């Protein structure tokens, strides 16, 4: 058993062990382990996040105090947003001299990232449901002046009905009126341009809640395309792409999506934060508008007859278009199989079945390797790297 797998001493954490029985590991963070646990009085399953604030004894006293304060701040924010249907619920907390135990709802469906790895890409309908719920969460947070700062598919959990729960508020912060942040934190491929600029320019005014909207745009693009909008194997070049806002709708997957969904993505991925779409504005976007039955006008008999005529004409036109379509021959399939939508999805699905184990298997492996993510990556000194 490794140090990470070892459980805290039962004597020092007596109150926790009296109420909960820890089980297998579900995930890991930089200084924490998430386990499934059983509530002894009710036999109910939960997830417990066990945070070692000493770093296994490697942290200095200042670092221990800093991590302790950060954990208390996370607990405070979770309590302030308690009750929201799409935010993970904090059920219980325990504290010792070296550990915190945070007990949450158990989301058995796992991370949105794993679901996306399995599905490759999502339909507009699936994306609409997930993004509407996520934007409603972000809207609630921003009304409380809370910025999450680490929005990504790994921090979005799913229940059995595909409802989402936002989790991991470790980087979250509640801003005072007019306050700006300068700390560089988050996951590289989801960082907003202004966060990167803060690390390079001491005179930069800082950033605010708008960084969450940029990350939301990256998530939406990734759900639809199956890969992030900004990616390069060299991290510095990827960060430059982010700062320049250089992305494209060039992959074949985008041919299957409407201009409406592309328009919403482009409103999120705006380099200047003041021009970026807010959560409230995004929810009013046509992509989320649906017909309400009561508001659909009733047709007159003449109108119904007109609809019938148009339907017949459309059916005839579709029939003749079908007759004119050239059959898919063996030569066409051999020449460009990826141009055919059914084959494209089949190829992608089998490619992920073959290579997916390289990404998400193994307890010590980074589950986000597919997108070059680094969980809890803090870019402390980008300016010390090669110049842009």
From Swiss-Prot:
**Which keywords describe this protein according to UniProt?**
ATP-binding, Calmodulin-binding, Carbohydrate metabolism, Glycogen metabolism, Kinase, Muscle protein, Nucleotide-binding, Serine/threonine-protein kinase, Transferase
Residues forming coiled coils = none
Q: Please name the catalytic residues of this protein.
A: 150 (proton acceptor)
Annotated region (Calmodulin-binding (domain-C)) at 343-367
Q: Which GO terms describe its molecular function?
A: ATP binding; calmodulin binding; enzyme binding; phosphorylase kinase activity; protein serine kinase activity
Sites where the protein binds ATP: 26-34, 49
Q: Give the transmembrane ranges.
A: none
Q: How does it assemble?
A: Hexadecamer of 4 heterotetramers, each composed of alpha, beta, gamma, and delta subunits. Alpha (PHKA1 or PHKA2) and beta (PHKB) are regulatory subunits, gamma (PHKG1 or PHKG2) is the catalytic subunit, and delta is calmodulin.
Domains as described in the record: The two calmodulin-binding domains appear to act in concert to bind a single molecule of calmodulin and are pseudosubstrate/autoinhibitory domains.
What name appears for this protein in its UniProt entry? Answer: Phosphorylase b kinase gamma catalytic chain, skeletal muscle/heart isoform
What's the source species for this entry? Rattus norvegicus (Rat)
């Amino acid at each position: 058993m490794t140090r990470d797998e070892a459980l805290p001493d039962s004597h020092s954490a007596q109150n926790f062990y009296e109420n909960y029985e820890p089980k297998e590991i579900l995930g890991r963070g930089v200084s924490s382990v998430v386990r499934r646990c059983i509530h002894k009085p009710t036999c109910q399953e939960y997830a417990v996040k066990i945070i070692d604030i000493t770093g296994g004894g490697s942290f200095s006293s200042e670092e221990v105090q800093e991590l302790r304060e950060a954990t208390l701040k996370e607990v405070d924010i979770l309590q302030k947003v308690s009750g929201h249907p799409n935010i993970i619920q904090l059920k219980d907390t325990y504290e010792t001299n070296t550990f915190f135990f945070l007990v949450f709802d158990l989301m058995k469906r796992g991370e949105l990232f794993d679901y996306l790895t399995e599905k490759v890409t999502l339909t507009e309908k699936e994306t609409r449901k997930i993004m509407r719920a996520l934007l409603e969460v972000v809207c609630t947070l921003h009304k409380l002046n809370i910025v999450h700062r680490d929005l990504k598919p790994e921090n979005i959990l799913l229940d059995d009905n595909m409802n989402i729960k936002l989790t991991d508020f470790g980087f979250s912060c509640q801003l005072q009126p007019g306050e700006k942040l300068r700390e560089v934190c988050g996951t590289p491929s989801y960082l907003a341009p202004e966060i990167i600029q803060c690390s390079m320019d001491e005179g930069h005014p800082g950033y605010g809640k708008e960084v969450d909207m940029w990350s939301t745009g990256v998530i939406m693009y990734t759900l639809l395309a199956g890969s992030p909008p900004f990616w390069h194997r060299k991290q510095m070049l990827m960060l430059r792409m982010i700062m320049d806002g250089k992305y494209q709708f060039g992959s074949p997957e985008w041919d299957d999506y409407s201009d409406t969904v592309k328009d919403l993505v482009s409103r999120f991925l705006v380099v200047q934060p003041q021009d970026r779409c807010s959560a409230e504005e995004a929810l009013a976007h046509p992509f989320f508008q649906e017909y309400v039955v009561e508001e659909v006008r009733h047709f007159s008999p003449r109108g119904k007859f007109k609809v019938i005529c148009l339907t017949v004409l459309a059916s005839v036109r579709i029939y003749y278009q079908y007759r004119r379509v050239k059959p898919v021959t063996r030569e066409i399939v051999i020449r460009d199989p990826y141009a055919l939508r059914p084959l494209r999805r089949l190829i992608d699905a089998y490619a992920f079945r073959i290579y997916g184990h390289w990404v998400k298997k193994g307890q010590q492996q980074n589950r986000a390797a597919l997108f070059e993510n680094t969980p809890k990556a803090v870019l402390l000194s980008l300016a010390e790297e090669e110049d842009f």
